Amino acid sequence: MNTPIIDFSHPLPAETTTPAADRLIDGDPRQTVANYFADPSQQFFAGRWSSSPGKWRIRYSESEFCCLMTGRVVLQNLAGDRWEFGPGAGFVVPAGFEGTWEVLEDCTKFYAIFEART
């Protein structure tokens, strides 16, 4: 079997989105997402995501590895613990995380997401 490597340097059409109105806290973030890979089970995904500044509520049912390429972001959990990341930072948001995601300056990240079927 000859399975190709997925190369993120090749441009893909991106989908433009915004956070749901009931989750938006501040700003008018515009987001683009280009999903480069989905496994046959549809439980694992990888791609590129970008956003303009804003802040919104998040509730993760999936686990996500992020590698921030540009910009600055802040994640804060419901207990008030805060994590700030800049270019080159890698981090995991585990399934079950609840809090906020804030983009301080235009950012781009690569992501890998696993969402177990229930």
Located regions from the model:
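Short hydrophobic/aromatic-rich beta-strand segments that constitute the beta-sheet cores
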Residues: 58, 75, 109-111
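Ligand-binding loop in jelly-roll beta-barrel domains
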Residues: 95-118
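Short, surface-exposed charged micro-motifs
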Residues: 35, 65, 90, 100
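Short histidine-centered beta-strand/loop micro-motifs
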Residues: 35-38, 47-48, 56-61, 77, ...
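Short acidic-glycine-tyrosine-enriched beta hairpin
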Residues: 79-95
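A short, N-terminal "cap"/entry segment at the start of jelly-roll beta-barrel domains
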Residues: 1-43
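Short, conserved beta-strand element in jelly-roll/cupin
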Residues: 60-75
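Conserved short histidine dyad/triad with adjacent acidic residue
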Residues: 42-60, 94-95, 117
